[in-house]
Swiss-Prot record:
Keyword set, alphabetical order: Aminoacyl-tRNA synthetase, ATP-binding, Cytoplasm, Ligase, Nucleotide-binding, Protein biosynthesis
Motif 'HIGH' region positions after renumbering to this chain: 40-51
GO molecular function: aminoacyl-tRNA deacylase activity; ATP binding; leucine-tRNA ligase activity
InterPro entries documented for this protein: aa-tRNA-synth_I_CS, aa-tRNA-synth_Ia, Leu-tRNA-ligase, Leu_tRNA-synth_edit, M/V/L/I-tRNA-synth_anticd-bd, Methionyl/Leucyl_tRNA_Synth, Rossmann-like_a/b/a_fold, tRNAsynth_Ia_anticodon-bd
Protein name according to UniProt: Leucine--tRNA ligase
The organism's place on the tree of life at top rank: Bacteria
Statement: the UniProt record of this protein carries the keyword Electron transport: no
Catalytically driven reaction(s): tRNA(Leu) + L-leucine + ATP = L-leucyl-tRNA(Leu) + AMP + diphosphate
EC numbers on record: 6.1.1.4
GO aspect biological process, one term: leucyl-tRNA aminoacylation
CDD domains the UniProt entry points to: Anticodon_Ia_Leu_BEm, LeuRS_core
């Protein structure tokens, strides 16, 4: 018989809320466990079925850990600043604050309808001044330590959005959100010196329990390179410029130089004959993001400036080109090109007919660049040396001549930390008329966002806050006039430290109490989408390391264990989107099938990190299993089945203990699909048995409760319990009940599988051999033959050799 999910879901959600069931306990005798989801941006669309996948996973672990005797911190909040709310407000004339508040209410209602065990007393919202007071405080500490500074930097400017967007938010020369065109232009921006932490961010990765693919993405993003910086000179003007190379040993093979289109020397050295093509190329490059420019698979483009550089090692003249694959912001903005031994340089040289000169033996440079090691040739004092020795010798030569030195370079660049928008944290800085810049005093934080704002972009590149003269203009006690900083922080700011605030969300004196942080941090389990692999996780690690260095927090790393859930695709195997009409609303699923069915189905679809297509058939199957669980224990009158008894005849011992062991291990490993499979095995066995031991029924209910909490609470109460099973002790298993007295063995005859036998643990090898020879199928292949040899591989296989 089917259960009534509408009634049961609401009943237990009400019970949990009224009893503050999931408030974080702080029993000093218990160990602590911190399970965290990447908190969502509350969009206007509300939850889609992709959100609950990660949320259900952390909820299962949080619920199990409570039952295992842990204090569990499992909070939820809102990453609510950001462009989408502001764009909506601009399009509709509504204030983003109102819109965001409504969205949060929708998200919270939907989350609660799914029965997640969040401690709502710790709810945080990045747009709450009581929260962003501490975001501003962190900015002020960064500024005091020289890690926040202003600079003129080339940025991705979107005229339509009226703001700067990050490199990662530009795709094919357009903004990721909205598809608006982007141009590169220099602007005054606030920067955070994340590069100061490049080495720490790199080395500390080794100690984290993170997917190797994510760690590798961070390593690549930081992009550490060891090599040399070499000074070249423009041939006629003798203007010096530096290049960075990881292969200084190939300097004799350099046949041209490439500068970034933005390099400061380009306009100085371009000849009149080349000026027009150079200007056109520079303009074209300004419309591309750094990511587009450096894509490995893109065709190389470039133009010659008409100028030459002198190779410092042999005096040869090298043509100076510009190409957009060289970035002004990486290294020195200029590279030496050795086409014989670099694939990208080779493709460029072939395309533009530039000389290719081999300096390492091996390969055929008429066909391809040779990038392997080998003996140096055509290289003067390096001839006959291998790569390692030649690099050392060349660096010594450069240092002796004063024209170069060993250098470590990072691809990582400082973080552009300002946005020309209204809906973000105000940057607590005042620019005074005498040129001084000061911070807003700490005791005046938070510097709040003015409520009634004309939030249209100013059009000048400044934030809409620039229009609010009453807010912008300030006078100090000595009559000195100043203007507030009108740029706001990016959406990444609030999410770079929120995991710390959850530990102590109501603290008015500090971002969080040091001892409480010591008790809870780092986060034990952090689950979210792989799309945050680089930025959010890198920024959060940077802020955490900085706060650790200044003694504000006790832990270096924020997230000990990270897991990325896969993407739930539409039933047509494409990404869910409104335009494709394949979005599934969780409200509809909960209404038709119940919250527990949605939770169970999403965990049973496949491995948690796999991308899997949504299936209504699979959803119906999940519901059918829950109905089978219900009817295994509850009769048609809604009463406990008579066969639930305190007597245990031992017939379910093995399957029950196997189930407890497997489910416990699988929950810890986040292998929820296989845990569910094992629970299905138990239910199938239980339904066939005349007597169900009460202990095993209760143990099973506890095991399924983290996945299907509403239905299991209902069965638990009908088993006679007057308290919730939130803190009911997790079941244990008896290893001796899992061990069996028999095991299966395969039988091979002359190397081919011909049958199997069931052997007793006490049987001797001779008895096993006799049983194998007596097998009906084996006898077909041994009849009339001499048995030359029988080999018993214990507990695995019997090999019979017959001639």
């Amino acid at each position: 018989m089917a259960y009534d999910h509408h009634e049961i879901d609401k009943k237990w959600q009400r019970y949990w809320a009224e009893h503050n069931e999931f408030n974080t306990t702080t029993d000093p005798k218990k160990p602590n466990y911190y399970a965290l989801d990447m908190f969502p941006y509350p969009s206007g669309q509300g939850l889609h079925v992709g959100h609950p996948e990660g949320y259900t996973a952390t909820d299962i672990v949080a619920r199990m850990k409570r039952m295992q005797g842990f204090n569990v911190l499992h909070p939820m909040g809102w990453d609510a600043f950001g462009l989408p709310a502001e764009q909506y407000a601009l399009n509709t004339g509504h204030n983003p604050k109102t819109f965001t508040k409504q969205n949060i209410e929708t998200f919270k209602r939907q989350i609660n309808s799914l029965g997640f065990s969040y401690d709502w007393n710790r709810e945080i919202n990045t747009t709450d001044p009581n929260y962003y007071k501490w975001t501003q405080w962190i900015f002020e500490q960064l500024y005091k330590h020289g890690l926040a500074y202003e600079a003129e930097v080339p940025v991705n400017w979107s005229p339509d959005l009226g703001t700067v967007v990050a490199n990662e938010e530009v795709i094919d020369g357009k903004t990721e959100r909205g598809g608006f065109p982007v141009v590169r232009k220099p602007m005054r921006q606030w920067m955070l010196k994340i590069t100061a932490y490049a080495e720490k961010l790199l080395t500390d990765l080794d100690d984290l329990d993170w997917p190797e693919s994510i760690k590798q993405m961070q390593r690549n993003w930081i992009g550490k390179s060891t090599g040399a910086q070499i000074t070249f000179r423009v041939t006629d003007s003798h203007e010096p410029f530096d290049v960075f190379t990881t292969r200084p040993d190939t300097l004799f093979g350099a046949t041209y130089v490439v500068m970034a289109p933005e390099h400061e020397l380009v306009q100085k050295i371009t000849t009149p004959a080349q000026q027009a093509v150079v200007d056109a190329y520079i303009d074209e490059a300004a419309h591309k993001s750094d990511l587009d420019r450096t894509a490995l698979d893109k065709e190389k483009t470039g133009v010659w400036t008409g100028a030459y550089a002198t190779n410092p090692v042999n005096g040869e003249k090298l043509p100076i080109w510009i190409s957009d694959y060289v970035l002004a912001s990486y290294g020195t903005g200029a590279i030496m090109s050795v086409p014989a031994h670099d694939d990208r340089d080779y493709a460029f040289a072939k395309k533009f007919g530039i000389e290719i000169k081999p300096v390492i033996e091996g390969g055929n440079v008429d066909e391809a660049a040779y990038t392997g090691d080998g003996v140096h040739i055509n290289s003067g004092f390096l001839d006959g040396l291998n790569e390692h020795d030649a690099i050392d010798r060349m660096i010594k030569w450069l240092e002796d001549k004063g024209i170069g030195s060993a250098k470590i370079n990072y691809k990582l660049r400082d973080w552009v930390f300002s946005r020309q928008r209204y809906w973000g944290e105000p940057i607590p800085v005042i620019h005074w008329e005498d040129g001084e810049t000061t911070l807003v005093p700490e005791d005046e934080l938070p510097l709040t966002l003015p409520e009634e704002a004309d939030i249209k972009p100013s059009g000048t590149g400044e934030s809409p806050l620039a229009n609010l003269t009453d807010w912008v203009n300030v006078v100090d006690k000595n009559g000195r006039k100043g203007k507030r900083e009108t740029n706001t922080m990016p959406q990444w700011a609030g999410s770079s430290w929120y995991f710390l605030r959850f530990v102590d969300p109501h603290n008015k004196e500090a971002l969080a109490d040091y001892d409480k942080l010591k008790a809870w941090m780092p986060v034990d389990l952090y689950i979210g989408g792989a799309e945050h692999a680089v930025l959010h996780l890198l920024y959060a690690r940077f802020w955490n390391l900085f706060l650790y260095d200044i003694g504000a927090i006790p832990n270096k790393e924020p997230f000990q264990r990270l897991f990325n859930q896969g993407m739930i695709l539409g039933d047509n195997h494409e990404k869910m989107s409104k335009s494709k009409g394949n979005v599934v609303n969780p409200d509809d699923v909960v209404d038709e099938y119940g919250a527990d069915t949605l939770r169970l189905y999403e965990m049973f679809m496949g491995p948690l990190d796999a991308g899997i297509a949504w299936s209504t058939k699979g959803l119906a199957g999940a519901r059918k299993f829950l109905d089978r669980v219900w009817s295994a224990f509850i009769d048609d009158e809604g009463k406990l089945r008579d066969r639930i008894t305190t007597i245990n005849d031992g017939r379910l011992d093995k399957v029950y203990n196997e189930t407890v062991k497997k489910v416990t291990e699988d929950y810890d490993a986040l292998h929820f699909n296989t845990a569910i499979s094992q629970m299905m095995v138990f239910i199938n066995s239980a339904r066939k048995d005349d007597d169900l031991p009460l202990e095993y029924v209760e143990g099973f209910v506890k095991m399924l409760a983290p996945i299907a909490p509403h239905l299991m609470e209902e069965i638990w109460s009908r088993l006679g319990h007057d308290h919730s099973l939130t803190y009911a002790p997790w079941p244990s298993y008896d290893e001796s009940k899992i061990k069996t007295d028999t095991y299966d063995m395969m039988i091979q005859v002359n190397g081919k599988l011909r049958g199997s036998i069931t052997a007793d643990v006490n049987e001797s090898d001779d008895e096993i051999k006799q049983a194998a020879l007596a097998n009906d199928n084996v006898q077909k292949f041994t009849a009339g033959k001499d048995i030359k040899k029988i080999i018993v591989v214990p507990r695995k296989i019997v090999n019979i050799v017959a001639k």
